[in-house]
């Protein structure tokens, strides 16, 4: 048996560190397929639901090679041969199938075949909308994996919907925090806060000993972000209508700046984005002490590098994936 946790492709090493810290010495490893980390576990408690870099958690119980002659029958027999203690006395369940690759059957066919077999065996009613137990059958190429999904919804949905409307997930915001080495007590700025995801993730991770500032020019978005912060019990975040091109006018010195700047679609030509980067980075340089860091996302890495002022050193870069888009993460340090 093993626990599989999913994340954004490109963040597997960070999730591996988090899992290894939660379950030290148990052999966590990155899966060959992108966006997955696994660790041998026979049982998982509530502690796993506090993972900040994971979307979903699945406790897998079996792995098998599919028979070419009767693959659906093989899945049914494998499911019936396994113990399913979660189904004993459960109010409802459903089977969720995920397929990768070409197969002579569909995901609904897998769900129906395995679901009917488990229903006959345990007498538990099927509920496709809000099941008490989610049985997972993942078919990846010629292999199949059977287990139980531990998460009803993604762990990344930890804030009100208003804070999740932007392009950045809390998992990516958490990655920026870790790559910037943000620690409790540090002062943090989110200068393009939008719906507030970065600010909320920073405040909920670092706690009230860390002042968190959040700025944006859009009053409506700032209002939604404030509401989300209050609903999340993060009342110490300081929201301010501010122009990220002139940071020193609005904010005091900070230790870390975490940013998801506009990608240029609303700024017109590349020159508009270049000047935004130019002004923002010089303002960031003015706010940071030596050793202070900026962690940001960009879809225009060459443009950002061209706008980089003297006084910053590039400490880290990586590509991540979110929803079919591949932004670059940069970590800059003031010299």
Curated annotation (Swiss-Prot):
The keyword RNA-binding applies. Pfam families: NFLD, THUMP, UPF0020. Its main location: cytoplasm. It catalyses: guanosine(6) in tRNA + S-adenosyl-L-methionine = N(2)-methylguanosine(6) in tRNA + S-adenosyl-L-homocysteine + H(+). It comes from the Bacteria. Keywords: Cytoplasm, Methyltransferase, RNA-binding, S-adenosyl-L-methionine, Transferase, tRNA processing. It is found in: Cytoplasm. One of its GO terms (cellular component) is cytoplasm. One of its GO terms (molecular function) is tRNA (guanine(6)-N2)-methyltransferase activity. Disruption phenotype: Inactivation of the gene leads to a total absence of m(2)G in tRNA but does not affect cell growth or the formation of other modified nucleosides in tRNA(Phe). Its EC number is 2.1.1.256. Residues 47-150 form the THUMP domain. S-adenosyl-L-methionine binds at residues 195-197, 243-244, 260. Consists of an N-terminal THUMP domain fused to a catalytic Rossmann-fold MTase (RFM) domain. S-adenosyl-L-methionine-dependent methyltransferase that catalyzes the methylation of the guanosine nucleotide at position 6 (m2G6) in tRNA(Phe). Monomer in solution. This is tRNA (guanine(6)-N2)-methyltransferase. The gene is trmN.
